[in-house]
From Swiss-Prot:
PANTHER family: NUCLEOTIDE KINASE. Pathway: Purine metabolism; AMP biosynthesis via salvage pathway; AMP from ADP: step 1/1. The lineage of its organism: Bacteria, Pseudomonadati, Pseudomonadota, Betaproteobacteria, Burkholderiales. It comes from Cupriavidus metallidurans (strain ATCC 43123 / DSM 2839 / NBRC 102507 / CH34) (Ralstonia metallidurans). GO terms for biological process: AMP salvage. Belongs to the adenylate kinase family. This is Adenylate kinase. InterPro entries: Adenyl_kin_sub (IPR006259), Adenylat/UMP-CMP_kin (IPR000850), Adenylat_kinase_CS (IPR033690), Adenylate_kinase_lid-dom (IPR007862), P-loop_NTPase (IPR027417). The gene is adk.
Amino acid sequence: MRLILLGAPGAGKGTQAKFICEKFGIPQISTGDMLRAAVKAGTPLGIEAKKVMDAGGLVSDDIIIGLVKDRLKQPDCEKGYLFDGFPRTIPQAEAMKEAGVAIDYVLEIDVPFDAIIERMSGRRVHVASGRTYHVKFNPPKADMVDDETGEALIQRDDDKEETVRKRLDVYSQQTRPLVDYYSNWAANGDASAKVSPPKYRKIAGLGEVDKITASVFDALK
């Protein structure tokens, strides 16, 4: 099972990725984790990436694809892998295809932006314990106060509506085009590609988590 999970920030990809990886016995691969591991291990690509990051630059797609190819040679990828947050752009997707990285499924978790804004901007957190509430779906007993300690809850900067909207704007411009890219490749093929086209599946990400998970597993049959 080799797949890419697509969806906007706050669509629930992380939750479903965990269930998918457990069911199929595959690792969840994130470029951030790969970069940190390569830098720590002092691999040639890691050294190259560290120079770029230390200078405040963005690591090139060539380096990222090199890290991906190295990562997929690891024994835990024998049964497959799940890409988390990669590719983010069309050039990265093209580079993956050119590098011959095989993908069986591209799964999109679709949640309307207004629902994501409500879901994320309503979160409130008790910092010391990590307990999380939601003003609408799981409110504390007393407004902005932790149920167990009576201490104040906060809204993280990442969850503020303005920040959420900015992240969704970036997603719309950079990553959303991947939906069309992969659905077109799945439907029409690409004679020049080194790998077979993936199957493209789209599921609704609203509702109870277990029902969404059931839809995910049905889509991956």
